[in-house]
Amino acid sequence: MAPRQKKPNKSDDDDGDLHRKKQSFFKQRFPGFKKKASELSVLCGNSVGFICYGPDNDLHVWPQSQDHNPQALHEIVAKFNALSDERRKNHACDLNDFPHHLKGLSREELRKHLLHLDSQLLGVREQKIEILKKTLTGSSEKDGARVSENSAISDHKLKIEPNLTDILSEDHLIRVSDKKLGSCDVFDELAYVVRGSRNLNENVSNYESKDAAYTGMDHLGTFGGNYLQEAAAELYQTYNLGNFCDDHVWDLEFASRLPPLHTFSDPLMTTNTCQTMSSDMISI
């Protein structure tokens, strides 16, 4: 049996490949280190620099003068070294000792530390109370303005309601409501206007001077109670409607039996010049 041949040792080749991988990885990540350092400098408003070694133990520093940075790394280090020890301690803190800063303190020191914490809490509480007061004051002012507006509206209503009550309690409304609808006196009080007149305050009596144009209507006479009495009597005799007596009071519950308006021969009862009651003529 032939002896087994030894395979070539590839450890040297593997080390070379690993070294090349590290170099390529460092080249890819180093620009990201510089970007993060510049962002930290901008956010904190302080000068930032770092020193690192590459895969070949070569030194890399940032920032450098060729990086268009206002301060190079050696300038930052010189500025830091120029600070006194007291100034450095003011801005230095050992994070490892921070949880144990109460250890080794005497009773008096602990009492002072607690008083300091209480004073800090009291200051925070006072600030919170001031903020709440300002908030409540602003809301109360808005509520006061709303209440004053509502009170003004209520006062205005109180001023209007007595006048409205006086108007609704006029004697002539009661007098008109007590009379029957068919009374001639009621028609005289309500007054009528001729449709088509420009002024609603003009009643039929204003058109008495124009009767000369109606030569065939001499039997109408003067518009008013007499005309309405004659019209009521004529309706009573023609259609036998309601009850008509000597005091000229008649019942108007015949609306369903009346013919349409356009069938009347009376020119004042046609659709063009029909007499219409005007609510504006009622003295309210």
From Swiss-Prot:
Report the GO molecular function annotations. cis-regulatory region sequence-specific DNA binding; DNA-binding transcription factor activity; DNA-binding transcription factor activity, RNA polymerase II-specific; protein dimerization activity
Pfam families registered for this protein in UniProt: SRF-TF
Statement: the UniProt record of this protein carries the keyword Disulfide bond: no
In terms of domain of life, where is this protein from? Eukaryota
UniProt keywords (A-Z) are: DNA-binding, Nucleus, Transcription, Transcription regulation
Task: Pinpoint the MADS-box domain residues.
Answer: 21-66
Cellular compartment(s): Nucleus
Q: Which GO terms describe its cellular component?
A: nucleus
Q: Name one GO biological process term.
A: positive regulation of transcription by RNA polymerase II
Q: Where is this region: Disordered?
A: 1-20
CDD domains hit by this protein: MADS_SRF_like (cd00266)
Primary localization: nucleus
Q: What does this protein do?
A: Probable transcription factor that may function in the maintenance of the proper function of the central cell in pollen tube attraction.
Subunit field text: Interacts with MEE14/CBP1.
What is the protein's given name? Agamous-like MADS-box protein AGL49
